[in-house]
Protein backbone atom coordinates (compact mmCIF):
# COMPACT_ATOMS: atom_id res chain seq x y z
CA UNK A 1 0.00 0.00 0.00
CA UNK A 2 2.96 2.30 -0.37
CA UNK A 3 4.14 2.56 3.24
CA UNK A 4 7.81 1.86 2.48
CA UNK A 5 8.73 5.12 4.18
CA UNK A 6 7.69 3.41 7.44
CA UNK A 7 8.77 -0.17 6.71
CA UNK A 8 11.79 0.05 4.45
CA UNK A 9 12.04 -0.87 0.79
CA UNK A 10 12.80 -4.58 1.19
CA UNK A 11 10.96 -5.51 4.37
CA UNK A 12 7.67 -7.39 4.49
CA UNK A 13 4.52 -5.50 5.46
CA UNK A 14 3.79 -5.58 9.17
CA UNK A 15 0.38 -6.40 10.64
CA UNK A 16 0.04 -2.73 11.53
CA UNK A 17 0.58 -1.77 7.89
CA UNK A 18 -2.00 -4.32 6.73
CA UNK A 19 -4.51 -2.87 9.20
CA UNK A 20 -3.77 0.68 8.05
CA UNK A 21 -4.20 -0.37 4.41
CA UNK A 22 -7.55 -2.02 5.19
CA UNK A 23 -8.65 1.07 7.12
CA UNK A 24 -7.70 3.32 4.19
CA UNK A 25 -9.60 1.14 1.71
CA UNK A 26 -12.59 1.17 4.04
CA UNK A 27 -12.44 4.98 4.23
CA UNK A 28 -12.86 5.21 0.45
CA UNK A 29 -15.38 2.36 0.25
CA UNK A 30 -13.18 -0.11 -1.63
CA UNK A 31 -12.62 -3.02 0.76
CA UNK A 32 -14.36 -5.29 -1.77
CA UNK A 33 -11.49 -4.61 -4.20
CA UNK A 34 -8.63 -5.27 -1.77
CA UNK A 35 -7.41 -8.36 -3.62
CA UNK A 36 -8.10 -7.20 -7.18
CA UNK A 37 -5.15 -6.06 -9.33
CA UNK A 38 -5.05 -2.32 -10.02
CA UNK A 39 -5.27 -3.00 -13.76
CA UNK A 40 -8.71 -4.59 -13.29
CA UNK A 41 -10.52 -1.66 -11.69
CA UNK A 42 -12.21 1.38 -13.23
CA UNK A 43 -10.69 4.86 -13.46
CA UNK A 44 -12.86 6.14 -10.63
CA UNK A 45 -11.93 3.21 -8.44
CA UNK A 46 -8.29 3.82 -9.34
CA UNK A 47 -8.54 7.42 -8.15
CA UNK A 48 -10.03 6.18 -4.88
CA UNK A 49 -7.18 3.68 -4.51
CA UNK A 50 -4.71 6.56 -4.92
CA UNK A 51 -6.58 8.48 -2.22
CA UNK A 52 -6.45 5.40 0.02
CA UNK A 53 -2.69 5.20 -0.56
CA UNK A 54 -2.38 8.83 0.52
CA UNK A 55 -4.52 8.20 3.61
CA UNK A 56 -2.35 5.21 4.56
CA UNK A 57 0.63 7.54 4.89
CA UNK A 58 -0.99 9.14 7.95
CA UNK A 59 0.21 12.63 7.05
CA UNK A 60 -1.62 15.84 8.04
CA UNK A 61 -1.53 17.21 4.47
CA UNK A 62 -2.36 15.41 1.24
CA UNK A 63 -1.40 16.84 -2.14
CA UNK A 64 -3.71 15.96 -5.04
CA UNK A 65 -3.15 16.81 -8.68
CA UNK A 66 -6.49 16.86 -10.52
CA UNK A 67 -8.03 14.00 -8.53
CA UNK A 68 -11.20 14.00 -10.64
CA UNK A 69 -9.56 14.13 -14.07
CA UNK A 70 -11.11 11.76 -16.61
CA UNK A 71 -13.83 10.57 -14.24
CA UNK A 72 -17.51 10.22 -15.01
CA UNK A 73 -19.96 12.30 -12.96
CA UNK A 74 -20.68 9.52 -10.43
CA UNK A 75 -17.03 8.85 -9.63
CA UNK A 76 -16.25 12.57 -9.56
CA UNK A 77 -18.90 13.02 -6.86
CA UNK A 78 -17.60 9.98 -4.94
CA UNK A 79 -14.05 11.38 -5.00
CA UNK A 80 -15.20 14.87 -3.94
CA UNK A 81 -17.32 13.46 -1.10
CA UNK A 82 -14.41 11.26 -0.02
CA UNK A 83 -12.25 14.38 0.15
CA UNK A 84 -14.89 16.15 2.26
CA UNK A 85 -14.88 13.22 4.70
CA UNK A 86 -11.07 13.15 4.77
CA UNK A 87 -11.08 16.73 5.99
CA UNK A 88 -14.01 16.38 8.41
CA UNK A 89 -13.30 12.91 9.84
CA UNK A 90 -9.50 12.87 9.82
CA UNK A 91 -8.68 16.55 10.22
CA UNK A 92 -6.56 16.49 7.08
CA UNK A 93 -5.66 19.43 4.91
CA UNK A 94 -5.77 18.95 1.15
CA UNK A 95 -3.74 20.89 -1.36
CA UNK A 96 -5.41 20.31 -4.71
CA UNK A 97 -4.53 21.41 -8.23
CA UNK A 98 -7.56 21.57 -10.52
CA UNK A 99 -8.79 23.28 -13.64
CA UNK A 100 -12.39 23.20 -12.40
CA UNK A 101 -13.25 26.28 -10.31
CA UNK A 102 -16.56 24.77 -9.23
CA UNK A 103 -14.68 22.20 -7.14
CA UNK A 104 -13.70 25.00 -4.76
CA UNK A 105 -17.34 26.09 -4.52
CA UNK A 106 -18.33 22.47 -3.88
CA UNK A 107 -16.10 22.31 -0.80
CA UNK A 108 -17.17 25.78 0.35
CA UNK A 109 -20.83 24.77 -0.07
CA UNK A 110 -20.09 21.78 2.18
CA UNK A 111 -18.96 24.17 4.93
CA UNK A 112 -15.23 23.51 4.63
CA UNK A 113 -12.66 26.27 4.94
CA UNK A 114 -11.29 26.70 1.43
CA UNK A 115 -8.49 28.91 0.13
CA UNK A 116 -7.97 29.37 -3.59
CA UNK A 117 -4.78 30.52 -5.28
CA UNK A 118 -5.40 31.48 -8.90
CA UNK A 119 -2.36 31.26 -11.14
CA UNK A 120 -2.08 32.93 -14.53
CA UNK A 121 1.07 32.88 -16.65
CA UNK A 122 3.14 31.48 -13.74
CA UNK A 123 2.07 34.29 -11.38
CA UNK A 124 -0.44 34.31 -8.55
CA UNK A 125 -3.39 36.36 -9.74
CA UNK A 126 -5.29 36.32 -6.44
CA UNK A 127 -5.53 34.31 -3.21
CA UNK A 128 -8.62 34.10 -1.03
CA UNK A 129 -11.89 32.25 -0.50
CA UNK A 130 -13.72 30.88 -3.54
CA UNK A 131 -16.34 33.61 -3.20
CA UNK A 132 -13.63 36.29 -3.22
CA UNK A 133 -11.45 34.87 -5.97
CA UNK A 134 -13.65 32.92 -8.36
CA UNK A 135 -15.49 35.74 -10.00
CA UNK A 136 -16.52 36.43 -13.57
CA UNK A 137 -13.60 38.78 -14.26
CA UNK A 138 -10.94 36.31 -13.06
CA UNK A 139 -12.51 33.44 -14.99
CA UNK A 140 -12.46 35.59 -18.12
CA UNK A 141 -8.74 36.31 -17.60
CA UNK A 142 -7.88 32.66 -16.84
CA UNK A 143 -9.98 30.85 -19.39
CA UNK A 144 -10.93 33.54 -21.89
CA UNK A 145 -14.64 32.83 -21.48
CA UNK A 146 -17.54 34.81 -20.16
CA UNK A 147 -19.28 33.26 -17.20
CA UNK A 148 -21.84 34.09 -14.57
CA UNK A 149 -21.70 33.26 -10.89
CA UNK A 150 -25.03 31.75 -9.91
CA UNK A 151 -26.06 31.64 -6.25
CA UNK A 152 -29.05 29.58 -5.19
CA UNK A 153 -30.40 29.76 -1.65
CA UNK A 154 -31.41 26.30 -0.41
CA UNK A 155 -32.62 27.45 3.01
CA UNK A 156 -31.79 30.28 5.39
CA UNK A 157 -28.33 28.87 6.14
CA UNK A 158 -27.31 27.15 2.90
CA UNK A 159 -26.35 28.51 -0.49
CA UNK A 160 -24.98 26.84 -3.58
CA UNK A 161 -22.61 28.83 -5.78
CA UNK A 162 -21.46 27.78 -9.22
CA UNK A 163 -19.78 29.41 -12.19
CA UNK A 164 -21.65 28.82 -15.43
CA UNK A 165 -20.20 29.61 -18.88
CA UNK A 166 -22.47 31.77 -21.01
CA UNK A 167 -23.79 30.10 -24.14
CA UNK A 168 -23.34 26.60 -25.47
CA UNK A 169 -20.16 27.60 -27.31
CA UNK A 170 -18.63 29.64 -24.50
CA UNK A 171 -15.01 30.41 -25.25
CA UNK A 172 -15.12 29.27 -28.88
CA UNK A 173 -14.50 32.09 -31.34
CA UNK A 174 -16.26 32.43 -34.69
CA UNK A 175 -14.63 30.08 -37.19
CA UNK A 176 -12.91 27.95 -34.51
CA UNK A 177 -13.65 24.27 -34.18
CA UNK A 178 -14.68 23.02 -30.73
Q: Where are these predicted regions, by residue range?
A:
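Conserved ABC ATPase signature
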Residues: 11, 37-41, 45
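ABC ATPase nucleotide-binding domains
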Residues: 13, 129-178
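Hydrophobic anchor residue at the start of the ABC signature
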Residues: 51
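Conserved catalytic motifs of ABC-family nucleotide-binding domains
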Residues: 58
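Catalytic Walker B motif of ABC-type/P-loop ATPase nucleotide-binding domains
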Residues: 62-66
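H-loop/switch region of ABC-family ATPase nucleotide-binding domains
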Residues: 98-99
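H-loop (His-switch) and adjacent beta-strand-loop-beta switch element
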Residues: 107-130
